[in-house]
Design a protein with these regions (language model features):
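Acidic, Ser/Thr- and proline-rich intrinsically disordered linker/docking segments
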Residues: 40-134
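Anionic N-terminal interaction surfaces
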Residues: 1-19
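Phosphoinositide-binding peripheral membrane targeting modules
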Residues: 14-56
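Glutamate identity and glutamate-enriched acidic tracts
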Residues: 4-5, 11, 26, 89, ...
């Protein structure tokens, strides 16, 4: 069933997202993360500078799973002065694809969300599961 969904999935960075799982390509292997195990999807941008002049930006997309593991969904590098926002686009695509199947997944990063997941992981998992069960 999953192999039939791959051609219609969302491809970005180094993963393919389908309505039932996210497949992450890692060093000659494929990690399959079921949608029911996804708690939080967020991005991180690291800026590289030389003599205080921006040289590049590293955009990394992360996924926090039910087991507490944080998985990188891939990285894109842009120029230091680039206005591109590949993370926003990738997160929006994932949200559009996954929302009908699992409404409780948290998207985007804020310190408040990070503190909530770090301080009460079991409660955060219950919250995501409860919101996913809502009609």
């Amino acid at each position: 069933m999953l192999d039939q969904q791959i051609p219609y999935g969302v491809e970005a960075f180094s993963f393919v997202a389908t309505p039932t799982a996210i497949l992450v390509y890692e060093a000659k292997t494929v990690r399959v993360i079921p949608i029911r195990d996804i708690m939080w999807i967020y991005g991180n941008v690291v800026k590289q500078t030389m003599n205080f002049i921006p040289t590049s930006k590293f955009h990394t997309l992360y996924l926090l799973a039910r087991d507490g593991g944080t998985y990188s969904l891939g990285q894109i590098t842009t120029g230091g002065f680039s206005k591109k926002a590949p993370l926003d686009e990738a997160v929006a695509q994932l949200q559009n694809l996954l929302f009908p199947y699992r409404k409780g997944i948290v998207y985007g990063y804020s310190d408040e969300i990070a503190n909530y997941f770090q301080g009460n992981f079991a409660g955060a998992v219950q919250m995501v599961d409860a919101k996913s069960m809502e009609p």
